[in-house]
Amino acid sequence: MIDETLFDAEEKMEKAVSVARDDLSSIRTGRANPGMFSRINVDYYGATTPITQLSSINVPEARMVVIKPYEANQLRNIEDAIRNSDLGVNPTNDGNIIRVSIPQLTEERRRDLVKQAKAKGEDAKVSVRNIRRKAMEELARIKKDGEAGEDEVSRAEKDLDKTTHTYTHQIDELVKHKEGELLEV
């Protein structure tokens, strides 16, 4: 029962780190990156569909992204979705493909994006700590019900603390890396 609780908590913490990694990759840096479009959804025949499922996204240059829709009639919808996103870019449509030029970030915008990255990192760490709290409650219940001895539960709590520290450290590293990317001119 203790092992299941620890395994479940670690699995959830891994997922929280994965979500944080995805969230941070969606924050645009000064360079073109196909991942920055991963959170954009397009209205596709009445259904909301990720842009990555409707087109191929390539980066031919450091500050240019080329988006080629699989269906030419979706050009306008994709262009509108990009324009209405929070990326702050202006796509151009030449009839076959959409070109997105990535402008240089201003110092003020960089600082805002760093704040955004730190906030996303903090949200992920709160999520990890909530997972830890729930696992600790489960361990306390196991101890109270007499399903395991006090020594076993104490050892499991220490293991859980180590695991929590490992995952919060991973999140800190992700945020630090993203901050470095954002502040790099």
From Swiss-Prot:
UniProt KW keywords: Cytoplasm, Protein biosynthesis
GO biological process, any: translational termination
Gene3D superfamilies membership: 3.30.1360.40, Ribosome-recycling factor (1.10.132.20)
Highest rank taxon of the organism: Bacteria
Ranges where the record places region Disordered: 145-164
Major localization class: cytoplasm
Homology family: Belongs to the RRF family.
The protein's name: Ribosome-recycling factor
Organism: Mycobacterium sp. (strain KMS)
